C-alpha cells in the first residue's frame, strides 16, 4: 500500500502543500480535487518521485519512493501533458518503460498499437492530443503498476474514447486491485468512478473521505420565495437563481437554521453531487 506521511513541498518561498498524510489502499479510486493552481500536479509528481519533498515521506510497503529507486516500479504517473515525451517514438517509450517495470506487458501495448493503426516508429509529437493521451493511458495499463496516478486523464478524449477508457479503468481495478488517484476537473466522471475524495486548498491536503461521507456533509435545497433574500452566511452557498427559485448548498446545521429563518414558500431537498461538494467546499456562488 502507498503511504504518505507529513508530506510538505515548498518551491522557493511559496508553500505548495504541507503535512499531507494519507494512504491509497488497493482496489480504490480516490479523486483529488481543488481549484486551478492548488498544487494537484505538484503533489502527483512528488508521489511518483519526480519531485523531491521538502519534508515528509512517501512509502510503498515501507520502502521510500525517494530513497529506494526500485520502489518507484510500483507507481506510474500519466501526466497532464506529453511535453516530456514529445521527441520520443512510441517504440522508444515502450522500451524505456519495459526496462523499468518488471511486469511490463509488451504484447498488450503492441496489440493496442496495431488495433489503433499506430506505427511504433511514430514520434509522440506527431500524434493528436487525444491519440497521445490514449497511448499513455494504455502504456500505464501495460506497466501493471499497482498504483496509478492520473492527471486530467480524459482531457482531449472524444466521448467514445472517454467512455471506453473509463470502462477499461473500472475493469482494471476489479481484476488487478489497482490503487488509483485521479486529479481532474471532470467532476461528473469522478462522481461515477471514485470511492473516495480528497481536497487540496490553501496548501492543505485533507485526508480522504468516502464519497458518501463527503456528500452527506452537505445539503442541497431548492427554495421558492415571494421575495428572494440576500443570503449572508459563510455556510450557505447559492448555486443558481431563476426568478424567485434559488438552489443552494448548506454546509452546517447553523447554515440550515439560517436558511429556514428566511421563510421560503417551498423547500425541496435535492441529491448532492460531487460538483455540488466541490462548489460548497471551494466557494459556492463565487466559483459557479
Predicted regions and their residues:
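Helix-to-loop junction immediately C-terminal to a conserved catalytic motif
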Residues: 48
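ABC transporter nucleotide-binding domain
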Residues: 166-181, 185-252
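C-terminal coupling/interaction segments
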Residues: 244-288
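ABC-family P-loop ATPase nucleotide-binding domains
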Residues: 79-135
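Catalytic Walker B motif of ABC-type/P-loop ATPase nucleotide-binding domains
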Residues: 148-152
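The feature captures the beta-strand-to-loop junction immediately N-terminal to the Walker
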Residues: 33-35
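Conserved ABC transporter NBD signature motif
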Residues: 56-70
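Conserved structural motif at the start of ABC-family nucleotide-binding domains
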Residues: 2, 17-19
Amino acid at each position: 500500500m502507498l503511504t504518505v506521511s507529513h508530506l510538505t513541498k515548498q518551491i522557493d518561498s511559496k508553500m505548495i502543500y504541507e503535512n499531507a498524510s494519507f494512504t491509497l489502499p488497493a482496489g480504490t479510486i480516490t479523486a483529488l480535487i481543488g481549484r486551478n493552481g492548488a498544487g494537484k500536479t505538484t503533489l502527483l509528481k512528488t508521489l511518483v518521485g519526480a519531485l523531491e519533498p521538502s519534508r515528509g515521506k512517501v512509502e510503498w510497503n515501507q520502502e521510500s519512493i525517494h530513497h529506494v529507486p526500485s520502489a518507484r516500479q510500483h507507481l506510474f504517473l500519466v501526466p497532464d501533458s506529453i511535453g516530456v515525451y514529445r521527441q520520443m517514438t512510441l517504440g522508444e517509450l515502450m522500451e524505456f518503460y519495459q526496462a523499468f517495470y518488471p511486469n511490463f506487458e509488451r504484447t498488450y501495448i503492441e496489440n493496442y498499437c496495431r488495433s489503433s493503426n499506430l506505427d511504433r516508429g511514430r514520434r509522440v509529437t506527431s500524434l493528436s492530443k487525444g491519440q497521445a493521451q490514449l497511448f499513455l493511458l494504455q502504456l500505464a495499463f501495460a506497466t501493471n503498476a499497482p498504483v496509478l496516478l492520473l492527471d486530467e486523464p480524459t482531457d482531449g478524449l472524444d466521448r467514445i474514447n472517454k467512455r471506453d477508457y473509463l470502462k477499461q479503468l473500472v475493469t482494471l481495478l476489479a481484476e488487478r486491485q489497482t490503487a488509483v488517484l485521479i486529479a481532474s476537473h471532470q467532476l461528473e466522471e469522478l462522481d461515477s468512478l471514485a470511492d473516495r475524495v480528497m481536497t487540496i486548498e490553501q496548501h492543505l491536503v485533507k485526508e480522504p473521505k468516502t464519497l458518501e461521507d463527503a456528500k452527506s456533509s452537505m445539503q442541497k435545497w431548492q427554495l421558492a420565495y415571494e421575495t428572494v433574500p440576500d443570503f449572508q452566511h459563510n455556510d450557505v452557498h447559492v448555486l443558481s437563481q431563476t426568478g424567485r427559485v434559488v438552489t443552494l448548498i448548506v454546509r452546517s446545521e447553523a447554515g440550515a437554521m439560517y436558511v429556514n429563518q428566511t421563510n421560503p414558500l417551498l423547500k425541496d431537498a435535492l441529491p448532492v453531487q460531487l460538483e455540488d461538494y466541490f462548489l460548497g467546499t471551494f466557494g459556492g456562488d463565487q466559483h459557479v
